[in-house]
Regions:
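One-carbon transfer enzymes
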Residues: 1-183
Length: 183
């Protein structure tokens, strides 16, 4: 199952990657934003969607729905809310996130999307990348599963950096998910 808050390009990429893989099934997409494009992308790809509020996430409503699905893995792909401890504790080592930087750099609260890419640019970094990590109770501090770097010293805008990072995300995130689920 996938959790997302926004456009959902990673979600769609993951769904399409696993269509022809009988060992892995994307069972649902949970979204906290009722106007997010990810909802349309999931529906277009015949994946059920559950929309919930921040209050439902904080209470046991989302936990109960997730538990009922018995997921082997919960994948955060552009999900912008912090998960409650009750959800993390119910699924130890079964929740992963992708972050658009090489953690521990540019992680933590408020560091997502363009904010990360702008910080990379502002600090004249020569490289950035992606990190896939387990989720714990602190933003972007879970155990690192996978990292991949890319040179960005030729980039002059945060948008150029974002484009390069998205290529990495789309290439490697589904493969990392597959490795975790088929070990």
């Amino acid at each position: 199952m996938l959790l997302a808050s926004g456009a959902g390009s990673n979600v769609e990429n993951i769904i399409k990657y696993f269509v022809s893989k009988p060992t892995v099934q994307v069972t649902s997409v949970f979204c906290n934003n009722p106007t997010a494009k990810v909802i349309d992308r999931a529906i277009e790809n015949h994946v059920p969607v559950v929309v919930f509020t921040k209050e439902e996430l904080k209470s046991d409503v989302v936990l109960d729905k997730v538990t009922a699905l018995e997921p082997d893995l919960i994948v955060l792909a552009g999900f912008l809310l912090q998960l409650p401890a009750s959800l993390i504790e119910a699924f130890p080592s079964k929740i992963i996130n992708i972050h658009p930087a090489l953690l521990p750099k540019y992680g933590g609260k408020g560091m997502y999307g363009q904010f990360v890419h702008q910080a990379v640019l502002d600090n004249n970094e020569k490289e950035t990348g992606i990190t896939v990590h387990f989720v714990n109770e602190h933003y972007d501090e879970g155990e690192v599963i996978f990292q991949k770097s890319i040179a960005v010293d030729d980039c002059t805008t945060a948008e150029e950096i974002a484009t390069k990072v998205h290529v990495l995300e789309h290439e490697f995130f589904p493969k990392v998910i597959e490795q975790i689920l088929t070990i």
